[in-house]
């Protein structure tokens, strides 16, 4: 029987790394236009999905603005405010969206050192693997200003990873983020299925004529670590929801996932249990760099606290919906 995209498949269960390659540079997405690939992937399984009701929208303009939520005064991830000796924990400020993505919203006194180490690890890995060329191209202001790196590795391998280094002025920067099936917590999608639906793209500056000067006829997007990417989206949603909802009113369903260290290559088959996209809810054109919208997700006579996270909304990237807990 032919397999349909969206069907459970033990052979791919736990796959962490995905990328998209261009073997024909004439097929690159048009400059400055949202696109998607692959376009000929065949039939896919449609799942019943929940309904999101937005209650409050937080927008992030292209120019970074420093803002603060109320101090949390305990670790937003593990819930602790004291160590094993009963002494007050040292708590640091938690950026809702990583500062390197040009966002300035912080929650003071919200992360213990142990949890901060884990979140910093997956945020730092994603910066290097996915976001650094985008940060440079858009001149996003991070903690130390605009990224100073001037050369980035370009994957030119067909079957295996093979890197070439190209000056940033000619580096073919194409933003690639996964479009997901609905999360299993608010849809009929099987819990053991973790493939992306497709990839949403935005060509920032990839010019076939320029690439030919480097004798390149093929290249790939950065490999997306789906586990760490899901951790990032869940962390953004969880931190903002913890500020919006009174902590005593809901029980988090993603905090343990966020503060679990998944070393590179380690399997994980539950990272998309609470993180996904909605097919029946179309994303509108947006002038905002990023968006966070808090609300509820209704599914099977249940209403769950949920958050919509949309990074690079102005580039047409998808919204991710996270069920962050239960009331």
Walk through the language-model features, giving the residues of each.
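Short, flexible, mixed-charge glycine/proline-rich loop motifs
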Residues: 59-72, 81, 101-106
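Short flanking/linker segments adjacent to small metal-binding domains or redox-active Cys/His motifs
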Residues: 154-185
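C-terminal, charged low-complexity interaction regions
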Residues: 185-327
């Amino acid at each position: 029987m032919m397999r349909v995209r969206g069907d459970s498949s033990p052979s791919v269960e736990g796959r962490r790394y995905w990328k998209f390659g261009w073997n024909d540079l004439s097929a690159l997405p048009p400059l400055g236009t949202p696109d998607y690939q692959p376009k000929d992937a065949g039939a896919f399984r449609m799942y019943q999905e929940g309904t999101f009701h937005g209650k409050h929208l937080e927008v992030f303009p292209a120019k970074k603005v420093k803002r603060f939520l109320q101090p949390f005064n305990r670790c937003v991830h593990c819930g602790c405010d004291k160590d094993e000796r009963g002494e007050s924990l040292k708590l640091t400020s938690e950026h809702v969206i990583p500062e390197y993505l040009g966002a300035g919203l912080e929650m003071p006194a919200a992360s213990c050192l142990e949890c901060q180490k884990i979140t910093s690890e997956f945020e730092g890995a994603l910066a290097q693997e996915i976001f650094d060329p985008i940060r440079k191209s858009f001149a996003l202001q991070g903690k130390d200003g605009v990224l100073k790196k001037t050369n980035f590795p370009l994957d030119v391998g067909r079957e295996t990873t093979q890197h070439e280094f190209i000056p940033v002025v000619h580096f073919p920067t194409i933003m690639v983020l996964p479009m997901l099936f609905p999360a299993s917590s608010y849809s009929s999608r099987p819990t053991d299925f973790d493939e992306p639906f497709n990839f949403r793209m935005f060509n920032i500056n990839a010019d076939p004529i320029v690439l030919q000067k480097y004798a390149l006829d093929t290249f790939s997007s950065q490999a997306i670590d789906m586990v760490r990417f899901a951790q990032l989206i869940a962390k953004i949603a969880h931190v903002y929801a913890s500020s919006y909802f009174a902590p005593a009113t809901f029980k988090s369903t993603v905090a343990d996932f966020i503060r679990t260290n998944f070393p590179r290559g380690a399997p994980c088959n539950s990272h998309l249990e609470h993180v996904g996209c909605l097919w029946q809810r179309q994303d509108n054109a947006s002038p905002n760099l990023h968006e966070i919208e808090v609300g509820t997700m209704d599914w099977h006579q249940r209403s769950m606290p949920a958050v919509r996270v949309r990074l690079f909304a102005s580039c047409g990237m998808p919204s991710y919906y996270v069920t962050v807990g239960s009331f």
